Amino acid sequence: MATSCCPAWSVMAKKLFPQFTDYISMALTPMVLTARLQKQKDPSCRIAFIGPCAAKKLEASRRSIRSDVDFVLTFEELQGMFEAKNVRFEDIPKEEEVPLNQGTGAGRGFAVTGGVAGAVVDAIHRMDPDREVKVASAEGLDNCKKMLLLAKAGKYNGYLLEGMACPGGC
């Protein structure tokens, strides 16, 4: 089994290792799932995702996953928009802070290499504390390709594999 929230990793794995396609998790990424849930509440809303990853643009545009995300901006693009409009955050009046609902630490770790696999292992251990779960993770597409080549050679039979295109994660 293989998993990742990284669209670049998923596309690379399916393209270069089509024999693994059926073993790559079809679970929706947090971006897609959040957009889909919001559109169910309000079908007329527009969803914008802002993050570090340009590959999320590809993910949002793929018809095969019906992402429900209308716009994707990278942090760099957003910064460019702020600069073009001379937005200065220090000039914006402060408002009373509204506490956010706390997510689990596992969810916050999805953007880090091995984060999704770590959350899966934690969930398995809550249900079956003695179950052995073997995990292999890689960061950077070259290392991800090496990991999948080793899996193809049978070195990771029974492992949960996770890859991230960017070193360190998103």
Language-model features and meaning:
Residues 1-170:
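Iron-sulfur-associated redox domains of electron-transfer enzymes in respiratory
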